[in-house]
Amino acid sequence: MSDRDFNTVSSALISIIDDDRSVREAIQGLIRSLGYATAAFGSAEEYLDSDRIHDTACIITDLQMPGLSGIDLQRRLIADGHRTPMIFVTAFPSDRLRKHALDAGAFGFLSKPFNETSLIACIDKALQRPIPN
């Protein structure tokens, strides 16, 4: 974290929503290694029922999950007045869904497997931080 202010970075909570536990844990490990606080959820409904909505600085969510999809979550949050930056990750990329997510304000749309640098760049953009070298 040479170019990052640890106190500023660690105060940002990033919520990770994915029905695949191994993906959640991998993303959570990467984000924690960057100094961010994280909260992980197995579904969009679990996130919506949590007390983390108001203190989440960025959401990283799977696109396709049982119950509410990532796009459904984005719609619900926007309808409720929450403009939390969102980054979508998916094993099933679709140009139509990508366009919809980005048009609605998503900061990234990554296909699984994605490289860590791409995810970090999306997080930095979402949090308006400089991208590390």
Regions from the language model: what does each represent?
Residues 1-15, 21-28, 117-133:
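Non-catalytic signal-transmission and effector/linker regions of two-component phosphorelay proteins
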Residues 40-58:
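Acidic, metal-coordinating helix/loop segments flanking the phosphotransfer/catalytic sites
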Residues 42-43, 69-72:
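Acidic catalytic/metal-coordinating carboxylates
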Residues 62, 90:
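Active-site residues of response regulator receiver
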Residues 65:
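Receiver (REC) domain active-site loop signature in two-component systems and cognate sites
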Residues 80, 91-95:
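Short, conserved "switch-loop" micro-motifs in signal-transduction and mechanochemical regulators
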Residues 112:
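A Lys-centered signature of the CheY-like receiver
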